[in-house]
Regions:
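N-terminal flexible segment immediately upstream of the FAD-binding catalytic core
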Residues: 1-70, 86-115, 262-270, 314-335, ...
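Short amphipathic alpha-helices in soluble, non-transmembrane regions
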Residues: 14, 72, 240-246, 288-302, ...
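General beta-strand structural signal in soluble alpha/beta enzymes
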Residues: 23-27, 58-59, 79-83, 101-103, ...
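Short beta-strand-to-loop capping motifs
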Residues: 60, 229-233, 281-287, 342-348, ...
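Conserved glycine-rich FAD pyrophosphate-binding loop
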Residues: 77, 84, 91-98, 104, ...
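FAD-binding subdomain of flavoenzyme oxidoreductases
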Residues: 110, 125-126, 130-249, 459-466, ...
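Glycine-rich, acidic
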Residues: 239-269, 304-324
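A conserved active-site cap/scaffold subdomain adjacent to cofactor or substrate pockets
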Residues: 261-307
Length: 473
């Protein structure tokens, strides 16, 4: 690891060599840009205190990025990629200083048509939707932060979100078609990597390659109706949500279940329903919505909010921004002692597990359930439960109780890629880093397998399907 003085000297030399790049050197701005939403976790807040870059650079195009990467490789200076900083695990927070590379200048759609889109990593997901919807297509899955989140950030640090009820997470087969990457070498190479190899760089926090472009398959566009329905009984709300999920003819984009008092944290909405009610937020295609009334009656619910999604989005009032980890954000604005979990239920018995865990914790853990298909296509549920936080020991005990009841934990309170995924070290992901970032300069400290690479059996050619772009002179 470089000393502070060595890093600062390298930054000064690179800045002097590349003065036309957009450099951000003011300490307050560097500190702000070195942050994401890891403050959702009291554990990460403590672990990442004081961690930041030495400087921030915002390349305007691929050529400027190439010059910057080459200089970092020559000087062995760490670099970490930044999208829009909507991640929750400190993905972009530099552990060893160096340069923070703001990718938002690379924000163009490269190709759009025939149900696919290829775009640069720094583009906002909302801008892809805006361009695609008039052509009859929309994103298959996107986070609730779609207005702010970048494509590269979703690819490097995200999972799925709105639309995953149909298409599964981003990593499900068929969603990602290819990625274009740049290596971190004194003479950087540019490669196009088709799926499935492309997924070796997905959710790796930008540790094993620089994502330049992502090619995605799109979904047919629908006119969506956003609904918030309320229930006095949690089991009724769960059964209504599950009935929506398991009705194949009900065209939907999103179904979320929120136990009380979560809906009470929605300060802009809560005058539309009674305090203490459970809620289900859904996006239902206009042509399918007629089914909701009978389902709602059967499960003793009532509708509190109904709005056209297109109109709501133009007013920045979409219910999509009350789902996924936006739910956590709204809750923390009201009660900053809360934190959250990430859980994955069993596709064969998720309704029973959800009810069991809601009853077991009796308000200490508050059910926030997102319904989706898993990567194998099974209808299932994931949780982003809110937790009334007391101590690290109790938080870990709560997570163990879920595990003991056959509910998987994807731990959002840890820094390293593998520790959020049940601790599994993947030699293929490490092999890609060795191929694309041989000096280990990308986001150092986040990929635990890199420190253990000498103990792993690594494929010397992990990207056999990749094609190299011929450099232009």
């Amino acid at each position: 690891m470089m000393t502070d003085e060595q890093r600062q000297h390298a930054v000064a030399v690179i800045q002097q060599a590349l003065p036309t790049l957009e450099w951000i050197l003011q300490p307050a701005k560097i500190k702000r840009l070195s942050r994401d939403f890891h403050w959702f976790s009291p554990l990460l807040t403590e672990q990442l205190a004081g961690k930041q870059a030495d400087a921030v650079v915002r390349p305007r195009d691929e050529q400027e990025l190439r010059q910057l990467v080459a200089a970092c490789a020559q000087h062995q200076l760490p670099l970490t990629l930044r999208g829009s900083a909507t991640g929750n695990y400190g993905q972009l927070v530099p552990l060893e200083g160096g340069l923070l590379v703001d990718m938002t200048g690379l924000n163009q759609i490269v190709a759009l048509g025939n149900g696919t889109v290829r775009a640069q990593a720094g583009i906002l997901l909302a801008d892809i939707e805006t361009a695609a919807r008039p052509t009859g297509w929309e994103l298959r899955c996107m986070p609730s932060t779609y207005r702010l989140a970048s494509l590269g950030g979703l690819y490097g640090g995200g999972f799925g979100g709105i639309g995953s009820i149909n298409y599964g997470p981003l990593a499900a087969p068929g969603n990602v078609l290819s990625v274009k990457v740049m290596t971190v070498e004194p003479v950087p190479r540019v490669l196009t990597i088709p799926a499935p190899e492309a997924l070796l760089l997905h959710h790796a926090y930008g540790t094993n390659g620089i994502i330049l472009e992502v090619e995605l398959a799109l979904a047919p566009v629908h006119q969506w109706i956003e609904r918030l329905d309320v229930f006095d009984d949690f089991a009724d709300a769960l059964n209504y949500a599950n009935a929506c999920v398991r009705s194949p003819g009900l065209v939907k984009r999103q179904v979320a279940l929120l136990a009380t008092p979560i809906a009470d944290y929605f300060s802009h909405l809560k005058d539309r329903y009674r305090t203490g009610q459970h809620a289900v937020i859904s996006l239902i295609a206009e042509e399918s919505e007629g089914l909701c009334a009978s389902l709602l009656q059967r499960h003793r619910g009532s509708n509190a909010i109904r709005q056209a999604s297109d109109e709501a989005r133009t007013q920045n009032a979409s219910l999509m921004e009350y789902c996924w980890n936006h739910t956590t954000l709204h809750a923390l604005k009201v009660d900053n002692t809360l934190t959250y979990l990430q859980t994955a239920f069993d596709p064969l018995r998720y309704p029973q597990q959800i009810l069991q865990m809601e009853q077991h914790f009796a308000g200490e853990v508050i059910s926030h359930i997102e319904f989706l298909r898993d990567s194998e296509g099974n209808l299932t549920a994931s949780g982003l439960q809110l937790v009334r936080y007391t101590t690290p020991a109790r938080l870990n005990a709560i997570m163990q109780i879920f595990r003991d009841n056959d509910v998987k934990i994807n731990n959002p309170h840890v820094l390293q890629v593998e520790d959020g995924k049940q601790g599994v070290i993947r030699p293929d992901v490490v092999a890609v880093k060795q191929s694309l970032d041989p000096a280990g300069l990308l986001n150092p400290g986040k990929l635990r397998g890199w420190a253990l690479r000498d103990q792993l059996e690594l494929d010397s050619n992990p990207l056999a399907l990749a094609t190299r772009e011929t450099p232009t002179t």
